Amino acid sequence: MVRSGKNGDLHLKQIAYYKRTGEYHSTTLPSERSGIRRAAKKFVFKEKKLFYVGKDRKQNRLVIVSEEEKKKVLRECHENDSGAHHGISRTLTLVESNYYWTSVTNDVKQWVYACQHCQVAKNTVIVAPKQHLLKVENPWSLVTVDLMGPFHTSNRSHVYAIIMTDLFTKWIVILPLCDVSASEVSKAIINIFFLYGPPQKIIMDQRDEFIQQINIELYRLFGIKQIVISHTSGTVNPTESTPNTIKAFLSKHCADHPNNWDDHLSAVSFAFNVTHLEPTKNTPYFQMFSRNPYMPETSDSLHEVDGDNTSMFAKILDAIKEADKIMENKTTSLGQMENNNLDELNKSKIIVKKKPKQLNPFHLKVGHEVLRQRKNWWKDGRFQSEWVGPCVIDYITESGCAVLRDNTGVRLKRPIKMSHLKPYIRESSEQESLYLLQGSVVADHDYIGLPEIPIGAYQANILVEDATIGIVDNELLTSSKDRELLEYRNTKISPLIDDHSSLEKQTFSLLDSSNQVLEYLS
C-alpha cells in the first residue's frame, strides 16, 4: 500500500533500492520502513530488473518507473497489429499481464480518453444504406424462381424442375431440368422470356455466387444485366414465392409418374392457373389476361376419351381441384382448432377476483380505544405481529389515517393506517372503572362489552333494538331463564343509569375523586 499523498514512482524506487542493497533509501521516512519491508516481499530482482510477483509469487510483471516507458507500454497495448484500438478493459488486461506500476488503472483510462482516434470512432455513426423496396404493381414485373428436385429420372433424362411464379398474379410456369447448373437454369429462364418477356427483377433463394453465374449467362444469352437478385437482399417484402399447394402436388405427381412426369408439367401449371383462387376471388389466368379461358361447358369431352378412358389433363385438373379443397379444408380446420383452443383456454382460466382491501375493517371512529401494529416478522410459516397500546383515536385524516393519543394524552407524531389498528378489549375490572370515570363517553365504544355478563343477556337486548337501555318489554321474555338474565342485567346497569345525570355534572380528576368512588362502590 502507498500512503496517501506519496508518489507511486518514488515508492517503487524505494522498494528497488531496498531489494538491491538491503538498506533503506534516503527518502524513506522511519514510519514507512515497515511498509517497505512488507511490500518488498512481492518483488524480486532478475537480470538487474525489478519484477512484481505478488503474494502467490506466480506473476512475473516488469516494474515500469519512467514516464517514457509507461507511454511506450500504453501505446503498444492500446493498438494492435491491424491498427484497431482496444477499449479500457482490454488495454488494462494487456498491460497488467506483463507490466506493473502503482497508477496503472488511472493511466490506462486517461490514455484511452485522450486517444484522438478512439474519440473520432466513438462519435462516428455508420448509417446503413436505405433499401428501396420493389413494389409489385403490374403483372409479370417481379417474379420468383424456385428449383425442385431431384425427382426420379424421366425418360428424357430430366431430374429437376424450375418453377417461375409472378408475385402479382400468382401465374406459374413449370419447366423440366436435366441438372441445376447455372447454364441449364439460364436456358430455362430464357425460354420463359421468349413466351412472356423478361420481368423487371427475378428473385432466387440461392447463394450469391450461383446468382452471379446466372446473371453472367443471361447477359451472354439475352443481353440483360443483373436481373436476378437474392431473396435475402431485402428489396422485397418476405412473401411466399410459390404456393404450398403446387409444391405438394408436384412432389406427389412426380412420385406417381416416375417415368413421364416431365411431360405433364405444362398441364399441371395450366390447371393450377385456371383453378386456384386468389384472395381477390380471381384465378391467376384472369389476373394475367383479364379474362377467363375458354373451357368446355360439360366435362364429357375431357372425361370421355376412347370410351371409358379419362384424359390426362382431366385427371390433373381434378387432382388439383381436390388438392385445393383439401388445403382449404385444412386451413379452415386449423383456424377452427385455434379458435376452439383459444375458447377452451379462456374458459379454463380461473379469474381470481381480488378481495377489496378493507381500509377500516373494524369501523373505528374518533374516541375509540385501539391497539396499533408496530412490526411484522416471519415465524412458524406466517407473519407475526406485535400490538402496542392502548391509544385513543384523536381524529381521522382525509387519506383515511388515524391520529392517535397515548394513555398520557400525548399525540403520536405519525398518522397510522386504519388497517394497522384493531379494537382494544378491556378486562372486566378495567371496564367497571372505565364506566365510572368516563360517564357517557363509554357510549361511543360500541365494540366494548361486559365480559362478566352471560351471552343470553346480550341476546335479550338485541331483540329490542329501539328500546331504552335497561327497559325491555316483559312480553318478549317468556321463560324464567330470560327473566333471571334480565334481572341480572338490570342490577349491573341500572345504578349507572340512575347516577348518569349526576356524574355528567361532576368534573373531577382521578386523585380528587378516589374517595367518592370508594364510597359509591361500598
Swiss-Prot record:
Family matches, as Gene3D superfamilies: 1.10.340.70, Ribonuclease H-like superfamily/Ribonuclease H (3.30.420.10)
A single BP term in Gene Ontology: DNA integration
Signal peptide per UniProt: none
Superkingdom: Eukaryota
Keywords: Phosphoprotein
Pfam families tied to this protein: Integrase_H2C2, rve
Integrase catalytic domain: residues covered: 135-292
PROSITE patterns: INTEGRASE (PS50994)
Classification via InterPro entries: Integrase_cat-core, Integrase_H2C2, Retrovirus_Pol_polyprotein, RNaseH-like_sf, RNaseH_sf
Any one GO MF annotation of this record: nucleic acid binding
Tissue specificity note: Widely expressed. Also found in tumors originating from parathyroid gland, colon, stomach, bladder, uterus and prostate.
SUPFAM superfamilies, A to Z: Ribonuclease H-like
Modified residues (Phosphoserine): S502
Alphabetical list of PANTHER family matching this protein: PROTEIN CBG26694, PROTEIN NYNRIN-LIKE
Name of the protein described by the UniProt record: Gypsy retrotransposon integrase-like protein 1
UniProt organism field: Homo sapiens (Human)
